[in-house]
From Swiss-Prot:
The keyword Cytoplasm applies. Residues 106-126 dip into the membrane without crossing it. It comes from Homo sapiens (Human). Residues 175-177 are extracellular. This is Trafficking regulator of GLUT4 1. Residues 72-88 have a biased composition (Low complexity). The modification Phosphoserine is found at S48, S87, S88. Residues 71-92 are annotated as: Disordered. Expressed at high levels in heart, mammary gland, adrenal gland, stomach, smooth muscle and skeletal muscle, and at lower levels in brain and lung. Strongly down-regulated in lung cancer tissues, due to hypermethylation of the corresponding locus. Expressed in adipose tissue. Interacts with SLC2A4; the interaction is required for proper SLC2A4 reacycling after insulin stimulation.
Length: 177
């Protein structure tokens, strides 16, 4: 089935299309980038040469360039970089970001030996969920689940100790009578 020959680029009069090369910011971004010392960095010939525009499924042009063609990355604005660093320093320390969050699996297993039987399986399950979240790359979720497993394990261990103390106390007071 033959298609009529279409131009490679849509005309500027068509609705929804934009003349990408008419924008001065686009030309500046495609041809040069400045580093901190105001020295011009040369990009590869694929960026400074003619644009390779292709049609996507909606009929709009897009540029097809892989990341390997860049010789130097475009610099980020200093205000964004400094605000990112400041917010990350204010919220968490560098050492906390580098270490993996604990899942408290051993503490959850110890809690399983306490006499609060159906409830002491919950920290074990949450601890395993924390470990799997860490393996999937969800560090915040793993940290949150690890803390919850620790809290529940400690709570159930204390409840188990209280139950044992009550049982021993009742046992010795009943034998004396």
């Amino acid at each position: 089935m033959a298609h009529p020959v279409q131009s490679e680029f849509p005309s500027a009069q068509e609705p929804g299309s934009a003349a990408f090369l008419d924008l001065p910011e686009m030309e500046i971004l495609l041809t040069k980038a400045e580093n901190k010392d105001d020295k011009t960095l040369n990009l590869s010939k694929t960026l400074s040469g003619p644009l390779d525009l292709e049609q996507n499924s909606q009929g709009l042009p897009f540029k097809a360039i892989s990341e390997g063609h860049l010789e130097a990355p475009l610099p980020r604005s200093p205000s964004r970089a400094s605000s990112r660093r400041a917010s990350s320093i204010a919220t968490t320390s560098y050492a906390q970001d580098q270490e993996a969050p604990r899942d408290y699996l051993i503490l959850a297993v110890v809690a399983c030996f306490c006499p609060v039987w159906p409830l002491n399986l919950i920290p074990l399950i949450i601890s395993i969920m924390s470990r799997s979240s860490m393996q999937q790359g969800n560090v915040d979720g793993a940290r949150r689940l690890g803390r919850l497993a620790r809290l529940l394990s400690i709570t159930l261990i204390i409840m188990g100790i209280v139950i044992i103390m009550v049982a021993v106390t009742v046992n010795f007071t009943v034998q004396k009578k």
